[in-house]
Amino acid sequence: MSSVKVAVRVRPFNSREIARESKCIIEMAGNTTCITNPKVPPGSSESVKRFNYDYSYWSHDPRDLEFSTQAMVYSDIGEEMLQHSFDGYNVCIFAYGQTGAGKSYTMMGKQEDGQEGVIPMICKDLFRRIQETESDDLKYSVEVSYMEIYCERVRDLLNPKNKGNLKVREHPLLGPYVEDLSKLAVTSYQDIHDLIDEGNKARTVAATNMNETSSRSHAVFTIFFTQKRQDRMTSLETEKVSKISLVDLAGSERADSTGAKGTRLKEGANINKSLTTLGKVISALAEIASKNKKSKKADFIPYRDSVLTWLLRENLGGNSKTAMIAAISPADINYDETLSTLRYADRAKQIVCKAVVNEDANAKLIRELKEEIQKLRELLKAEGIEVQEGEDGEKKIHSPNRNRKRTGSSTEMAVDQLQASEKLIAELNETWEEKLKRTEQIRVQREAVFAEMGVAVKEDGITVGVFSPKKSPHLVNLNEDPTLSECLLYYIKDGLTRLGTSEANVPQDIQLSGSHILKEHCVFENKDGVVTLVPHKDALVYVNGRKVIEPEVLQTGSRVILGRNHVFRFTHPEQAREKREKNKEVDVCETPGNSGEIADWNFAQCELLEKQGIDLKAEMEKRLLALEEQYKREKRAADQEFEEQRKTYEARIDALQKQVEEQSMTMSMYSSYSPEDFHQEEDIFVNPLFESCWTAREAGLAAWAFRKWRYHQFTSLRDDLWGNAIFLKEANAISVELKKKVQFQFTLLTDTLYSPLPPELTPAPAVGALTNGGQEDEFGQNPIPRTTVAVEVTDTKNGATHYWSLEKLRQRLELMREMYHNEAELSPTSPDYNVESLTGGDPFYDRFPWFRMVGRSFVYLSNLLYPVPLVHKVAIVNERGDVRGYLRVAVQPVMDEENADFSNGVKQSARILFDEEQNGQHKVPKIRTIPDKDEKYIEGGNEMGTKLEELEQEDADSGRGDSSVASELHESNDQEPGEHLQPGKEFTFRVTVLQATGIAAEYADIFCQFNFLHRHEEAFSTEPVKNSGSGAPLGFYHVQNITVPVTKSFIEYLKTQPIVFKVFGHYQHHPLHKDAKQDCQITRPPPRRMLPPSIPISQPVRSPKFGPLPCPPSSTVLAKHDVLVWFEICELAPNGEYVPAVVDHSDDLPCRGLFLLHQGIQRRIRITIVHEPTPEVKWKDIRELVVGRIRNQPEPADDEDSDSCVLSLGLFPGEVLEVPGDDRSFFRFEAAWDSSLHNSALLNRVTQTGEQIYITLSAYLELDNCARPAIITKDLSMIIYGRDARTGPRSLKHLFSGQYRNPEANRLSGVYELSLRRASEAGSPGVQRRQRRVLDTSSTYVRGEENLHGWRPRGDSLIFDHQWELEKLTRLEEVGRVRHLLLLRERLGMDTTPNPTTKTEKDVCNLAQRASASPVHMVIPPSPQTPVKDQQAPAMPERELSVRETELVWKCVKLIQGRIGCKELGAEGNGSGTQASDASPGDEGCADMNASYISSNSIELCSPERVDMPNGWEAPAPAPQTQDLSLRLYVPELEEIRVSPVVARKGYLNVLEHGGSGWKKRWVTVRRPYVFIFRSDKDPVERAVLNLATAQVECSEDQAAMVKVPNTFSVVTKHRGYLLQTLGDKEVHDWLYAINPLLAGQIR
């Protein structure tokens, strides 16, 4: 084993470094190389770094005595490596360093004597030693190959047939090798010299055509050296084979130092990939060598990451003697690159190679290859494939299964491996004479190719290398890389010499290729020794930097540039000789000789830029001046802005100071009052300073508003969740690290009847909010319990669940931290703490009871007032509103004659006192039949605009169908109690717990406990009953007699309050295994209209340009508009156009669809906005389109800050479209969407089966007269298929319907409501208060967070989930109360009313029931032109309604409306009174819609069957709107409307629009409150939307007679009118009922 020999060589300064006056930072002393950091002060510890290598060559200054020449480098490294090759070892020498560091000079050198590099010198010395030592017993053979690695592609430089890229294979015996790479036999150094020259020519041609240079490619020159020695004594022939690999690496590129851009930047990236991989390999090998002992697991070395390291695998740490020459620059401007090179070289010293003598390699290799070929033939024969040898030696493969489309992958691999092995064995069996013959053939082919290209050749046919003709004019190539310059020479013969490409119709004498070279580019005319260049039309030809269009006479030394990359120097030997002899002082033809500059490639390029008007220095100075001016301008703007801000802050400070002074003056006035003054009648609130003249109605409204404000608490709950999330994360992290089986998560708890809070979780009331002992506030109302944030502790070890307050969490967290710090002091033999976990000593655990709460039930006692017995079947409900079973309870009064009978099943008796003082101390919250809207503690459950009178009306009429029952029973309850409830007497009643049913089998030992709400300490309990789980009822049959002295408080309790029943059971199974299953089996699903949509309406994606979204304004809504938006995702088609991707509308849901995309294709997102024309809404342009929230589930993540996939798309300007025949406003814009920039695997890969991808896009649009951008947000779902996959649906439904043939069907619709609010500078105080910023600590890092595997504390979504639970509890409570009242009413015989229900009441009730099935209820008031009385007259005669009937009719009307009526109907009113207006606040600014039609003298309407319409007819149109077009600033709000999935009616209608050309048959779908118009029933895209909430519907016989079209009715919106005709007479009423149920009922 031997280490890699490492040498470092420093070159002289180049012209660039001299021009920049660089300083030398390299010093060498012996084998030590020192580098000085120019950025660090001299003398510091980090200023100088020292490295020791095997050799350090000082080649900086030739005048130095220690200057190292090429010969010295070769004598130290080359001779040693050559000796190793004669010994039979593999040898490798490679040069490493940055671009321009001198690698190519060290390896190749120059043609002058003494300037040869390592490669020519080692080849020359090789053949010298061969000639000296060759004899009859010792024979030598040498073969060479020359390849180039560019951008991970391998090219053969010696064989012109191998024009393409060669494959790199790996053989188990040979290792990595290049397939079909030419290995040419050579017999002398001159042969190698010529092959190197030929290879450089091929490299030059390819580099010129591809615009490359050698510094961007790796060159590998390999010599295969074979020694055959004949042993005369044994007559045995031994063979040694060594491989000499000479590598010239590409320079390491730095984009900022080389100025690389575009393609050059990509080339540099590929070069750096190879060099980076080489560095990784060197580091890995050095690390392995530095280890003391070999690791058990083999270390991974990334050889395969690049072609270069793969081919050099044996030379790096393998079977090779390797030397590395690190070339460095001495300049300080290259400090970073030089230091990196030195570090790589230092690491390479540690690499250990295991070189062995390659003796008798061929014999062993041939034998093993033959065995491998035989095995492969047997394998193919077993597969039914025979390999036969043809007449020409070619292997022919015969397979009986040719008709199969494809064979197995194993068979194909075997055939491929067989062919590769046979190529190798044929190459090894080739004799030396055959190799020489093949080499000569390749040389002839190569010369022919060069001659065909026009490269000059000698008389013997050999191409010209470094040779200058004496007479003939010629062109010599110039290249950016000096090693490739002057390699190619092209003669210009007498007469015409054509130059072009090989594809020209006329054969070209000089053939070039590459960009901007025409088929016939130009012609050189050589006449009488004068060469004229004649360019063809549109050909790029430059002479001495000037573009040539007309014929140009060339002078010797002229620089000729053809196309973009081909640079030549024209030379005329005779002309140059004459000029020199005639006058040497004349500057001929702008040659640069006099100026001392060399006419190389750089000179030609600079000359081109200068002559074409591109002066680099002038451009740089101009750019510097522009930057300086920009800096001054920005500095002035910044200073001005700073001055304005300073003045603003000073003004704000003055205003605050003035405010403080005013407050201090006011408080000084109060200081004159004594404390006794405030306890007298002259209170501060009746002080003249605070006197307010409020009426009783205003005071009541203020009290209602104050109570409503107190019940809103979403913001405080969110603050608690955000502020304590970091504590929750830390507790979970400690729990995981200490291996505690406890998990903590936020939850919300509200003190309700079904979920009472323990005292430690009850939130403290606000200071001053409660009076009278904390029971009632100043308004005489009991406060609704506030919702509190708690921590749900899931103890999976003990199978229990606890709830902690936030304060308890912080206290326990301190103990957890202490336990965590003490954990390190415990030894492995420390005892387990299971005892502490059970006794409560461990801060992670709490004590848990044996029995667990199953649920609660409530039984009302109103039947005891009458007195009658009742048997109740009540639901057992848990804390989350889930029904866990049912309980049967009997409640009956015990009269005097029954008191003595205790033998009939009576188990227990008790006596309870209901005295007034005790009841006052334990007053329970008042339970209403239906809570008032102002007392409903579910935030957001009521309307702000509801009037106080309507709230008072709600107390008497809940609108839910139970008011009549409650009112009748309340009237009875308000009467004097019966004789059995006379105050002072004792009253006994009996509560019998009969049975429990439906309780899950997981609960064992069930028992029931009940008590009065205010007497928790006096509870009655049954005996436990075994729950077998068979489904049979659990019989308790527990009888409890209760005797109570009758008081007013007891009577009040019987009227309003229930008894609570608590059912307990021992939970015998582990909760984590059964809870989830139990929840899924028993939990009732919420009603359909309460469920969240499958794809929720997301909040806008945060824009990088606009920052966080501002708070929504609370100012007045000035106008509302309905907006229809179409979304399309377009993909690049083969014809170059962007075609909309297929959208699958198979789910038949409104505004829903699934985009079917292809992988790896360019896409664009196209959005079209459609709305009615209005002067208020004018789109200016699209400001930004943001795409983010990439996910595979419909709901986005709670934490938006962690979304790293947000991408702002490149925008195209928006445009206003004009659609023929449609006068609506259309605004469309597009954005380029490169989904790979999201760096999301979901968008990069093909979507898995059954999976869908969801994204959220937000478009920020600018409108006229709007202070903020309008934001359109939409969630899109998609599936990504393979690039060539067909995305069209394959179902028979779509096959026969042809739904997807129309490209306009491939779009997704969205319905939005645009609200324009008045812009406010400061906003209301509520807005300012809501703008406070609370830090969300859920994303703050906590030590150990990575162990949580992505777990996050719950956020805002928890509040909405809790709202649904509270809604369920409220409904269960209401249902239980109403069920009790109905049961009591039936028991009392109150169902037989004296006045039976009339037919009118039945019709109205049926109408209300049918209308309530629709999810949205809206009433469209009839037009004054169509009185209701006239339409109702034919249906039934008018009659006077009683008060009772009037109340019933009015309640049904409110049921249809779905909200409270706007105007209370008086007792004397009739059913045909004027209805209240339904206009929203946003509609107040709009003019009333005029539904009247044209006068009777208008032209008749044609029927829908007639095609041509009269020009004079006008459809029903709204009245002209008088808008104030003065400049007003608005704040736009675009909110997506979730369209109801319920279809009220769908079918074909004939539609006539205002201003339309005629009747059109359209498919119409009614999803209240919207009507969608489609082109046909197969059209999945909504083309138009009508909002029934703001429309007016009319249908009358007068209207039909006037338009002379039967079966018609009109729909008039704010902007246009529609006339609709049904296809049949019977459908008119059904359509009217679907659109306007009240109007249909009136006409009926």
Curated annotation (Swiss-Prot):
GO (cellular component) term, any one = microtubule associated complex
Query: Which ranges carry the Kinesin motor domain?
Result: 3-351
Indicate where this protein resides in the cell: Cytoplasm, Cytoskeleton
Q: Name one Pfam family in it.
A: FHA
Note the SMART domains from the entry.
FHA, KISc, PH
| PROSITE patterns in the cross-refs | KINESIN_MOTOR_1, KINESIN_MOTOR_2, PH_DOMAIN
| Region (Disordered), start-end ranges | 391-412, 952-984
Q: Where is the PH domain?
A: 1542-1640
* Residues bound to ATP: G97, Q98, T99, G100, A101, G102, K103, S104
Keywords noted in UniProt:
ATP-binding, Coiled coil, Cytoplasm, Cytoskeleton, Microtubule, Motor protein, Nucleotide-binding
Record GO biological process: retrograde neuronal dense core vesicle transport; synaptic vesicle transport; vesicle transport along microtubule; vesicle-mediated transport
Query: Spans of biased composition, class Basic residues?
Result: 398-407
Composition bias type Basic and acidic residues, residue spans: 968-983
Question: Which GO MF terms does the UniProt record name?
Answer: ATP binding; ATP hydrolysis activity; microtubule binding; plus-end-directed microtubule motor activity
Please indicate if the UniProt record lists Flavoprotein as a keyword. Answer: no
Coiled-coil residue spans: 358-434, 611-670
What the protein does comes down to: Required for presynaptic maturation, has a role in axonal transport of dense-core vesicles carrying synaptic vesicle precursors, components required for the morphological transformation of axonal growth cones to mature boutons.
> Member of which family?
Belongs to the TRAFAC class myosin-kinesin ATPase superfamily. Kinesin family. Unc-104 subfamily.
Q: What is this protein called?
A: Kinesin-like protein unc-104
Protein source organism: Anopheles gambiae (African malaria mosquito)
Its gene name is unc-104
